[in-house]
Regions:
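Extended alpha-helical scaffolding regions
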Residues: 60-137
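Long, mid-chain structured domain cores
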Residues: 108-176, 181
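Charge-dense, extended regions
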Residues: 148-227
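Surface-exposed polar/charged interaction patches
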Residues: 47-54, 78, 82-85, 96, ...
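Charged/polar, solvent-exposed surface patches and flexible loops
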Residues: 20, 24, 39, 46, ...
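C-terminal recognition-helix end and immediately following basic linker
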Residues: 1-41
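Charged, amphipathic alpha-helical linkers/stalks
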Residues: 29-74
């Protein structure tokens, strides 16, 4: 009697050997629920929707046996690592601009996509993401006695600069609360140099005028939040 691996069809004499056996096909099946793998799977589906017009018949089994599996999983894990603020939009941008799959994990591509996305994204999305980021930061830093309300006032300036330059904190928030404005005024020249390209004051001040209702809505929420 032999025992057969249902993933690679290899046969074993002992059931215990089959149990500890880990072929590539089995490994891919076992990691199917990992966040990075799922993001890679979604990107794979979107790739086929964009290039072939439909991916209705594409299953995880199709993905796991695809020659593109490793490339898309690498990309999915990259999205997790960089904390991509909108994985679907970024994937669509890569496809629309015909970026080679082998290059999808390059930081330069994300940096190229991000500024335009921050200008186009829904105001509510920017606000919700920022408030969550502030709350997460406050949860990890109990020394902030007033929680996320102290984010701009007493948070680590370099960390906040990083949050702004990676899109975690949008100009919608920085420019529309007292804490954000005070934070910008207190930056040193090096920090200002990093932040400035991401907050583009001329552009955003005009946008706030063009979308006055959204601006007043954001200001009201941030004021009530104590920021």
């Amino acid at each position: 009697m032999t025992y057969t691996c249902k993933y690679c069809t290899k046969e074993f004499r002992k059931e215990s050997t089959l149990t500890v056996h880990l072929c590539e096909a089995k490994r891919r099946y076992q990691q199917r629920d990992e966040t990075g793998v799922q993001l890679g799977f979604k990107a794979y589906i979107r790739f086929y929707e964009t290039t072939q017009g439909s991916a209705r018949l594409k299953t995880y089994d199709d993905f796991a046996t695809s020659p593109y599996y490793n490339a898309f999983v690498k990309f999915g894990r990259h999205l997790v690592a960089i904390r991509c603020i909108n994985t679907a939009s970024y994937t669509d941008w890569l496809l629309k601009n015909n970026k080679k799959l082998d290059y999808w994990c390059k930081d330069a591509l994300y940096t190229e996509w991000l500024p335009d996305y921050l200008r186009r994204e829904a105001t509510q999305d920017a606000l919700e993401r920022a408030l969550k980021e502030m709350q997460d930061y406050a949860d990890a830093h109990p020394e902030l006695q007033n929680g996320f309300r102290d984010y701009f006032r007493y948070g680590n300036a370099n960390r906040i600069v990083y949050h702004i330059s990676t899109g975690r904190i949008s100009p919608w928030i920085v420019f529309n609360c007292a804490g954000g404005i005070e934070f910008l005024e207190g930056l040193d020249p090096g920090q200002t140099e990093i932040v400035l390209p991401w907050i583009d004051p001329d552009y955003w001040q005009q946008r706030f005028k063009d979308y006055l209702a959204d601006t007043e809505w954001v200001k009201d929420i941030l004021q009530k939040a104590g920021l």
